[in-house]
Amino acid sequence: VRGRVTVKPEGLSRFVTALDNEGLHRWGPLAPCSRVSVEMDNPQLNWVGHAYMDSNEGDEPVENGFKDWDWARCEMANGDTCVVYDVRPQRGPHRVVAQRFSPNGDHEPFTPGQRFALPASGWRIPRGMCNEINEAPQIISTLEDTPFYARSLLRTTLMGEPVTAIHESLDIPRLVSLPVRLMLPWRM
């Protein structure tokens, strides 16, 4: 595989928030509204589209802070990016962080609608996502399915707009289990 991937931020964001109830784990999108171009020489493929860059950091191991989480992001019709972080902390109540980001760096919270259980992945990873209409979001395809993590494309409605979202589910007890830790050096 040979080629070039170029990510061009349309603007930078200074938004950072706690994901857990004690403020020990933080998330912030660095460039939530970006463009990406992929130019491959071998194989000869080209692609351009919406991109997103973020950062997570913590003052303790992830397994100390969380049981699992679902995360999703989508590009809105006007070029904004909506992100939903739906986390189940080890301590305290369930948390949902939902923010809409503009290319100029502005952001605003929003209410993402009711959470629906989605079909488990092939590795039986539980998945869930919100939708503003009274039906479960539709999984278009599962892009990655491992013993602890699933990434999918799905259709849902956020802020009154039907969207296609990148969705991720992480099962942290599985991530830190001995069999998975032994497999991590190899592609799963």
Predicted regions: what is each one?
Residues 1-188:
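Structured soluble/peripheral alpha/beta segments that form catalytic or ligand/cofactor-binding pockets
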